[in-house]
Amino acid sequence: MTMITDSLAVVLQRRDWENPGVTQLNRLAAHPPFASWRNSEEARTDRPSQQLRSLNGEWRFAWFPAPEAVPESWLECDLPDADTIVVPSNWQMHGYDAPIYTNVTYPITVNPPFVPVENPTGCYSLTFNVDESWLQEGQTRIIFDGVNSAFHLWCNGRWVGYGQDSRLPSEFDLSAFLRAGENRLAVMVLRWSDGSYLEDQDMWRMSGIFRDVSLLHKPTTQISDFHVATRFNDDFSRAVLEAEVQMCGELRDELRVTVSLWQGETQVASGTTPFGGEIIDERGGYADRVTLRLNVENPALWSAEIPNLYRAVVKLHTADGTLIEAEACDVGFREVRIENGLLLLNGKPLLIRGVNRHEHHPLHGQVMDEQTMVQDILLMKQNNFNAVRCSHYPNHPLWYTLCDRYGLYVVDEANIETHGMVPMNRLTDDPRWLPAMSERVTRMVQRDRNHPSVIIWSLGNESGHGANHDALYRWIKSVDPSRPVQYEGGGADTSATDIICPMYARVDEDQPFPAVPKWSIKKWLSLPGELRPLILCEYAHAMGNSLGGFAKYWQAFRQYPRLQGGFVWDWVDQSLIKYDENGNPWSAYGGDFGDTPNDRQFCMNGLVFADRTPHPALTEAKHQQQFFQFRLSGRTIEVTSEYLFRHSDNELLHWTVALDGKPLASGEVPLDVAPQGKQVIELPVLPQPESTGQLWLTVHVVQPNATAWSEAGHISAWHQWRLAENLSVTLPAASHSIPHLTTSEMDFCIELGNKRWQFNRQSGFLSQMWIGDEKQLLTPLRAQFTRAPLDNDIGVSEATRIDPNAWVERWKAAGHYQAEAALLQCTADTLADAVLITTAHAWQHQGKTLFISRKTYRIDGSGQMAITVDVEVASDTPHPARIGLTCQLAQVAERVNWLGLGPQENYPDRLTAACFDRWDLPLSDMYTPYVFPSENGLRCGTRELNYGPHQWRGDFQFNISRYSQQQLMETSHRHLLHAEEGTWLNIDGFHMGIGGDDSWSPSVSAEFQLSAGRYHYQLVWCQK
């Protein structure tokens, strides 16, 4: 044990937090989570241990601007002005200091290993009681599961130790410091340390004791470590559980270790042995270690599909059977290996349906509770995810147990990121920083290696490629050869990775960056000598209204076996709750706490909002990742299962044939599909509709019974086909009425019964409509070529740093947002049964014509207004965001009804999950409440739209809400939006894709850009 004077002044003088060679003082060695059961049955059933005591709850707390400001007296007693704070928590979430959101830029001046003199410091203290029995025998430990970023610990006024690495436990022996009865802990937490230079992750920078604190009482002679691994024969019919156990304390001849393996209530295997390990070299072996091997016939294999678990109980006892203590862990029999360029689990090539997940809670910051963790896992499973990357640090210990039990593949990632360094490998190639990096990698492996869900180790994130990475790669491969290692830094295909694991590489487009090119994922596989699998560690940047082009990735994954999937960036928006002056909560992002530097809303890249409400894009991910694929030939549906291990035993296939959303026939067939098998379903002869319309066959795979992660009735997969329809023509009903045209100097006015249409001759716009005496429009019907910018449109542009390549900057520079209409033509003609208004406009900016829009409005005797639009786009202007029409309707109706793709928001490059049907939703549901307001709520493939007294028919896209594009564009946060008068309607003949390969460069694929020079569309507007 390192001995240091208890004086605070001496501790401060040492400045351990500015010494990369000091990562801990007196911290105990890493190991899997312990409970020290004194009853083996409690260990088997994972009941709470009487030897493990939580110290979570209210602690005393005082905040200081720097450690030097902490008074020496605090070591002995609480300060008069100390407050209370909940542990675990981030102190910034309790009004102390401010959270800082930054992506790449370090939040402190870069001068490693030194940190600012103004180094916010939190002083925690807790008074607790210890029973005399804990002091008479054994060892009492204190475990801090997570403290950011470094801390010193005192007990009863005496210095105990020091720890850093905010995402792994720091554990200390308190035995020599405790007394029977009342004891006092004092923990001094520093916001910044030299470890902060290794923790430059894209997240909020927060501080404090943010994970659990507990006391653990172990016997004097104790289990100090244990590790389980599974080995198999070629066909997985026989397995061996290999358990390595290490003890410490008095090594006596009478000591024995028993490892028993349980499957539920049944003991499958057991073995007992005295201590004395295998011979290592000519000097012998380890006297305090032992390896046991238990044979298991026909093991129930673990996978994310079927997470079969056994329970291993490790008992330390005497020869006569007297139990000293027991430890235990869940065991999953599974094998991970790379063979012939494929990542295999239990001999089958995996397809990673993955997502990156930060530990984030909108109210609690980086504090994770079990309820939130389970909620995340259930949502992931329900949306066809099978893997999660712990980005970018080891997670709360409970997370891995839950992934074991519910079934998720885990990439466990070391808490190392130096993204803000120049060059990025400045520290990771420096041997002075190897001890700090080594602690972060080795301790992660030692803590988590018993978890079957952990199938890949990661050396960290965005830290370049240095010699330290190569050393740590070799260490992992020597200690745990059962798992591959991945690391993206330095180009994603260095010597430090078993898997090509790029981030944001595109399907077909090379990005030839200097030193670290990102090849297209298809090309990467064919590079000379490249035989590794490719799994994208990050792709599909889900920032705001995004995930366009996601289907292209999944087409490639299914086409090329060595393209084995990837991890979407990312799971949850990292917004935080703030309160306005009236106590109303609102969602905040970078800069909202006065934090500098900050990267604004770049913290919100989630498939779900911070409160776990899904983004519409989550449905697209679910659909593309679904485990059943479908093919239609005539009346035959072929269902293919992509499950590797699971036989469909809880699935029904529902099919429906509908004409314009009206069901004509339906049925239900049980699915009985072997893993990777097929089932052919023959449909009956389908009825032929008598009327015209779109005929669609829709299939849904429904789970009739509840599972551990889904309720009964859960839909896991679906598909639609448009069927051939009989050719027929429905003639409009004859009308004897003829609209009446009145011409004045200012207007053309058309009347028919109780309806009137007014066209302004000076503007050329439809300026008003009446039904009876009620006006229908608050603004004229105008052409529209812009949208409120998406995050993907903005890229890295901001007020102080313009990216001229970003779509929004190109649109602004070209004048798309400022364009004014110059009237070229506005005429009226009376036809035999209708009135025809013809208009033409040149949309100009600073004398330059950007668009020419020609429209005809044909109002017939039935009251229908048929609108025909032709648009010419100037060849030298950027491709527009949309080509459509917009107006502000006077009504506010409760519901919106449409025939088209839905029900969720969808866009041209993100619509594979949308179904064609007749949908009816509240108006409020047509708006997607992205925290950073933008274009939202589009519905594509629309044949009919009904709202209030109005109906629109044609083939168009629309969005409808209380917010104008102008307001969405000018507003920084959703809570600042105000419902405008009436309802804003946008009807588009064409709309550009949204992109999403990344959010900092134009990522809309060419096929989804509006690159043609001419566009034509039609629609009919009438009243019901």
From Swiss-Prot:
Major enzyme class: hydrolase
GO cellular component, one term: beta-galactosidase complex
Taxonomic superkingdom: Bacteria
Requisite cofactors: Mg(2+); Na(+)
Feature type site, description Transition state stabilizer: 358, 392
Active-site residues, record numbering mapped to chain: 462, 538
Cross-referenced PROSITE patterns: GLYCOSYL_HYDROL_F2_1, GLYCOSYL_HYDROL_F2_2
Complex formation: Homotetramer.
PANTHER family in the record: BETA-GALACTOSIDASE
Alphabetized HAMAP family for the sequence: Beta_gal
Record-given protein name: Beta-galactosidase
Organism: Escherichia coli O17:K52:H18 (strain UMN026 / ExPEC)
